[in-house]
């Protein structure tokens, strides 16, 4: 997927030219989504949706790390303080009401805090706004077919094309580095930045999943059904997506 600052959504000829000159654009724009050796971080966020999800992920990671550290320290303290040698006479009480209240309320409050931040992100993703541009993505084994429903070609047909994976020996000629193998395609969706894009996802044969990690979006493509996602990209680039479902026979 290529995102550019200038784009004519109603000029089919312009879209055709953009698709035909994919090699030049691949060389001119930053490529986002290629594998990083030893990488453990998220891809650079290309949308506010992705930025929000990444912030939420980091926040929850901090909470989880704090819980794990607390449990480990508490376990170590109990092992040292209450082993048979240090505490030969065990306690005889059977319960501790304040402690039981605490270990009930603290997890509940923790979940409430996490939910108060995660639910707005969920609603933001699932509430589809009015689209500036709509595209349809149909999953096939093993490629994607795209349509621009609102864009017509010179002969009045809806603009559509297939995006087929490039083989290793084809990457250099198309302007892609070797590490984009299994991600780069011969044709790419071309869209503008700063516009609301709605993607309608379906499958032609089996269940697929259209995913763009840098945008923080993923939608299953089920044959006979239409699922929708949306995004508004904030930076130019060539973004590499993938199918995140084992879609084969």
Q: PLM ranges: what are they?
A:
Residues 1-27:
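N-terminal secretory/membrane targeting signals
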Residues 12-16, 59, 68-72, 108-111:
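Hydrophobic alpha-helical membrane-embedded or membrane-associated segments
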Residues 20-21, 75, 118:
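Hydrophobic membrane-targeting signal helices
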Residues 27-59, 79-249:
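Non-transmembrane, membrane-proximal soluble domains of secreted or membrane proteins
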Residues 64:
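Active-site-proximal cofactor/substrate-binding loop regions of enzyme domains
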Residues 68-82:
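Alpha-helical transmembrane segments
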